[in-house]
Amino acid sequence: MSIDYRKTVNLLDTPFAMRGDLAKREPAWVKRWQEEKRYEKLRKLAAGRPKFILHDGPPYANNDIHLGHAVNKVLKDIIVRSKTLAGFDAPYVPGWDCHGLPIELMVEKLHGKDIPAAKFRELCREYAKEQVARQKKGFIRLGVLGDWDNPYLTMDFKTEADIVRTLGKIHENGYLTKGEKPVHWCIECGSSLAEAEVEYEDKVSPAIDVGFKVVDTDKASAAFGADAAGAMAVIWTTTPWTLPANQAVAAGANLDYQLVDTPKGKLILGKDLVESAMKRYGVETYRVLGEAKGQALELLQLQHPFYGRQVPVILGDHVTTDAGTGLVHTAPAHGLEDFQAGLQYKLPIANPVADDGRYKSTTELFAGMLVWDANPRVIETLESHGSLVHKSKLEHSYPHCWRHKTPIIFRATPQWFISMDRKANGGETLREVSQRAVDATEFFPSWGRARLDAMIKNSPDWCVSRQRNWGVPMTFFIHKESGELHPRSAQLLEEVALRIEQQGIEAWFSLDAKELLGEEAEQYRKLTDTLDVWFDSGATHFAVLKQRPELAWPADLYLEGSDQHRGWFQSSLKTGCATIGRAPYKQLLTHGFTVDDKGYKMSKSKGNGIAPEEICGTLGADILRLWVASADYSGDMSLSQEILKRTTESYRRLRNTIRFLLSNLSDFDPLEHVVPLANMVEMDQYALLRAREVQEKVVGELYSRYAFHHVVQEVVGYCSEDLGAFYLDVIKDRLYTTKADSHARRSAQTALYHITRSLLLMVAPILCFTADEAWNVLVDSEEESTLYHIWHEFPAQTVEREAALSSKWQAIRELRAAVNKEIEALRSADKLGSSLQAEVEIDAPAELARHLASLGEELKFVLIVSKADVREAGEVAIRVSPSAHGKCDRCWHYRADVGSHAGHGAVCGRCVDNLDGQGEPRRYA
């Protein structure tokens, strides 16, 4: 009776399927993880370990999550999981930013504007709560592990109270100031904007040259050494609407100016800009009458171009000759540099523009006009007064509101600021403390340091007050006459904070001042301003990290998009330094934006976005997570259907490797079958050494410096080159054809067991679903998780033994690659079938020849040929020829003894021994 030899080989199966079906199966795993309370279990397991705290920058509670959200949360999850596997207690408390204008606008859209303030805030709170639930569902679907049942919300009563306390501490430390300063003002918002709320877009503006007639002719003539009668000092501006607020013309003290006679009259211009100005005016013939330093023009009186008042020439360091005329129109109410110069010269800070962007009723010529509509009227007025020298248009970068995408204005308003340059109680300015804190912070990528440092160096005072309804109130009492804060502000603020803990911000808005001030209430009013939402999120290091027992201050890491250098990173830095004197983080990591395959930023309006929900629903969250990890987040991260296709292919290769490993461990019990390292087949010892080297690089170097795309490259390369193309390829013969319980096979399985554990733990932070699916198969328990363990610990040998192993097997691998090249050449020429049909003769130098010869008959298994002979020679030479022998039906080797064994068909003696005898011994391969 013939034997079916296919049934005699050790081809095992595994419940770990070839196809992941992630999109269908992941939701069930998510549900099971929640039911098992994995996060809570992990906290108990990690209790007592050193902590690693990643503080979540709160996304805004509005609309579904987009791809940028997914990138951010997946990167955070990879870090939290990898730190957990590294032996840390790494809790993750997700958060949401819940106050602010976008929610107000949505509530107005849904319910209208005519709503009582208290009811409006209630509706805002309800809306934010709905949005949090909506986004939470999306983040959980991504496999992000965290305390989803107890997130922090900036609208939590306790958090609102602690935000108020943070403000109080900043006031106590002497950094809070009040003043009328020019701030970014959005007409549509009806509120000031923080730096982080301003975006720059291209805009076409009128560009005009305006003449200010010289009043003090004698002073000007003396300065230029020429007759200046009838001369005009010329400024250039792209904001004609600010001219009603003009109070001076600024010159550079050390810049050279010329008095130029032109067809347009006598003009005073910066020397370096005369030629470009004449070209702009279309003037070909002109004559320089005289020259003077800016210093000589200081306090020269000029006539306002259309009002009756006179304005002086002042000196300012901000004046340059890069463009324009070298003289600068100065309106202290409409620009920060103008404002600073105005303070120095005690100029009026006259703001003619109201909150709605219209000129106040007292503004001569332009009362009631919207500033943008006034530009043509201002130009007409200049023409009628003979003050317009030239007009044109200019496309330039201009600040816009990030919400409305509309141009904003600078206008002086009474606001509250956190001062950057006031020496506070500690004797240092906030700028000094903040710059020292930046120096002490580690940045990923490293260029983030220069960016944040430059922002702190150039940061104006932080305007923290807003004229909004839905926000944390600035809970101060202001004296009605003096405008000063109540002398007991610190005590009163704490009393209010205690009430807010119980009732939320409504405790302040509904508060009768008499409850806290008694008879003093007649002299004080409640401040009605709310805090900038960047202050809310910036204060969460105090409101969350310092208040929750499972967390710690400062955080080890803040991780957000690169736009947060000017946003959350900066607001957190300033509140940390202003309250505690240092940054609330040790490390900052920034990632780029998501772009399409053409490099364009993804957006709904362009229709080039891919929603996380779509990817999870078709391919699975693990594919999305693998793409995030594979992309170099230090720059913009490209995604397209083609990139997703390539990512899916990489995933399949990884999955197939894991499936092969698990299949060949189906009958392996680590408690019973493990072979001690010293007794293992030599190639298996080398495989463990390589696996450990890879893990040490991935864990000790790449994960620790957050180089996830290099983690993926290293792991994929290892699976492809070390495992697929070498080790697994070689040991198939031993796994399949030796006796099931033989030392040779159990040695290979021991190596595979260590490799599988290590590999699954290395990919677990990235492929959280797949790694746990495979882990459950490996340990035969659905209640197990990779996260309940730490990085795999390999058995180790002496340094000398490992060095010898590595040197020997690296040389053998290089020789094997050369043999394969020769075999492939014959196969391409149709002179050879499989590599097992080949017989090989090798000439090699002495050391390599000794390495090869030491394997004896087992060299052929390493080369996957049927015969291999080695001869010492001066250089490597390889000769490959087809075997003349028959093919074994069981192991497919070509041997002389095939078919020569009684009771067996076309099989070789090796297979007969493995079937009926003691089994073949293996020492090397």
Curated annotation (Swiss-Prot):
Q: Where are the transmembrane segments?
A: none
- Per the annotation, how and in what number is the cofactor bound? Binds 1 zinc ion per subunit.
Reactions it catalyzes: tRNA(Ile) + L-isoleucine + ATP = L-isoleucyl-tRNA(Ile) + AMP + diphosphate
Q: Which UniProt keywords apply?
A: Aminoacyl-tRNA synthetase, ATP-binding, Cytoplasm, Ligase, Metal-binding, Nucleotide-binding, Protein biosynthesis, Zinc
GO biological-process terms attached to the record:
isoleucyl-tRNA aminoacylation
Subcellular localization: Cytoplasm
Residues the record lists as binding L-isoleucyl-5'-AMP: E560
What EC designation does it have?
6.1.1.5
Query: A Gene Ontology MF term for this entry?
Result: aminoacyl-tRNA deacylase activity
Q: Which residues bind ATP?
A: K604
Residue ranges annotated as motif 'HIGH' region: 59-69
Q: What is known of its domains?
A: IleRS has two distinct active sites: one for aminoacylation and one for editing. The misactivated valine is translocated from the active site to the editing site, which sterically excludes the correctly activated isoleucine. The single editing site contains two valyl binding pockets, one specific for each substrate (Val-AMP or Val-tRNA(Ile)).
HAMAP family in alphabetical order: Ile_tRNA_synth_type1 (MF_02002)
- What is the documented function of this protein? Catalyzes the attachment of isoleucine to tRNA(Ile). As IleRS can inadvertently accommodate and process structurally similar amino acids such as valine, to avoid such errors it has two additional distinct tRNA(Ile)-dependent editing activities. One activity is designated as 'pretransfer' editing and involves the hydrolysis of activated Val-AMP. The other activity is designated 'posttransfer' editing and involves deacylation of mischarged Val-tRNA(Ile).
State what protein this is by name.
Answer: Isoleucine--tRNA ligase
What organism is recorded for this protein? Chromobacterium violaceum (strain ATCC 12472 / DSM 30191 / JCM 1249 / CCUG 213 / NBRC 12614 / NCIMB 9131 / NCTC 9757 / MK)
